């Protein structure tokens, strides 16, 4: 709207100038009457007066001069005088105007000349309007400057109630939220029951403080939510805002600091002042590590500004005046970099770790996000929760959302297990490259590589299970073997770590064992294996040579300063490298031994991969135990992937849907014919018949 107003103003001024120009032209052409007034100098006036050319003279005091007007006895002829119109070269002049110096000598000379020539002389008093006119003329520029300055200030401030303008830098952007606008409640937060209870207590204290005050308790001044990304820290804060019947101020840590010095501290003061006026109130600072980092670890003016902002937060939370009636919630996934003064009791009294949910928590989260999604009968949310250890709430929500998008792409009315399985692959590995043409040699190498991972994982299966093996290219990989822990893992044993290392080395071991040649496909395996082996040696104390010490793996351990200088000697570094190589070599030798003892099973898994490209957990176990597996109908999106336009993609999806309908109709016809034949058997007991129908349905 501001742009439109500015354009209208500019166009109005333009039309005003056009109008004035036209008026000036009209006045120049037609405005001058035939009786023209001529402006003459003082000398010309005195000469004309002495020559008896003037009929009458009028003298009137003006602005520091005497204004003289009068008429000629005879009309004068004027030629192109500057006081005349350009379109009238010659005119008859009967009147004149002139000026005199405002002194007695000038006035006496005019009076004497008029008396001598017997010319009529008239004197008038000065007009009072001149004073007001002069005053107005002098005030107009001042008023214009004041108006322009006011408009600039108003525009810089963002208008009425505006934010982000030049003059509002020191004002906090946080506004109290209306609980009616926030639909998130504690019932919408699943998988974090203990964390939720801690925050429910805070809300209860605000609503009914007498229950706690009677026992001498005080509400925590600050609650810090810490944990990995995606675990629901901000969602918990939204639930607090939705449940609390008090003003809720929300602000990001990065919103405090701007390009001007002192803005951050000013915004902190303004935020807490507004919260204190609305007390009891809650302040939520998201990603507080953006402003609450440890002091003295950086250089430059930006760091000084951040430290000044942090100091103001420390003062407001627990300074001389305190912040009575105001509770501070904050979230971060980097609590290790926060300043110790910020974390001490009296500021953040309660620290809540919001970690990855366990299997029950994952199932509860899946149930929450599946409420608005129609699921097929073959979808088991409990099984999905068991198969997704380490997933956080954001991952699970994205998993079901991607599955719903895939089901819509395939023109399904419900989300089935195949959609969820494909969605998991797409999220973590990328979409399948169905048009990626691999040579037969590359496919065979990839198949044996992934079969090596799977076989070692099947043999060393005390802690992990092989869920899937595929040679379908996705993202930057040509295939992968998915192995997940059997249960939620909170500690890693030495034997379990050795299992993981052997599984990671299974791919390269299979290449060497079958083809006696290595490929670049194991680079990511080596990266993971090296990282795990290094952690075993430097962080977990699993090396006899180095002992039970922590050399790396912590921000305060392993490095003496910010420049990255190591706190241990070169000899220790050499021992670390030797131990990492030893663990990797032992894992490789273990994998080679497993493959040598199970060569027939390795070949069976690889040939099955070359045939169907993807094997699930049951198929892999069947091949390992029996040498055969059951093939299943796999969703094929090849035609959808090849489509070049929306119309072609829609046609391909409709064709697939039509084929599926024909298949279902055929099954229904077979079922109806079976039911019809059974109805003819009059000797069958009704109870037995009902059981037979149920069995037939289950088999189908």
Curated annotation (Swiss-Prot):
Positions in the Cytoplasmic compartment: 1-10, 152-700
GO molecular function, one term: ATP binding
Annotated binding of Zn(2+), by residue: 449, 453, 525
Gene3D superfamilies given in the database record: 1.10.8.60, P-loop containing nucleotide triphosphate hydrolases (3.40.50.300), Peptidase M41 (1.20.58.760)
Compartmental location: Cell membrane
A Pfam family it matches: AAA_lid_3
Cofactor annotation: Zn(2+)
InterPro entries tied to this protein: AAA+_ATPase, AAA_lid_3, ATPase_AAA_core, FtsH, P-loop_NTPase, Pept_M41_FtsH_extracell, Peptidase_M41, Peptidase_M41-like
Note on how the cofactor is bound: Binds 1 zinc ion per subunit.
GO BP terms: protein catabolic process; proteolysis
Active site (record annotation): 450
TM spans (from-to): 11-31, 131-151
EC number(s) reported in the record: 3.4.24.-
Topology of the protein relative to the lipid bilayer: Multi-pass membrane protein
Topology feature Extracellular, residues: 32-130
Region (Disordered): 644-700
Family membership: In the central section; belongs to the AAA ATPase family.
Description of how the protein assembles with itself and partners: Homohexamer.
Protein's name according to its UniProt entry: ATP-dependent zinc metalloprotease FtsH
Gene: ftsH
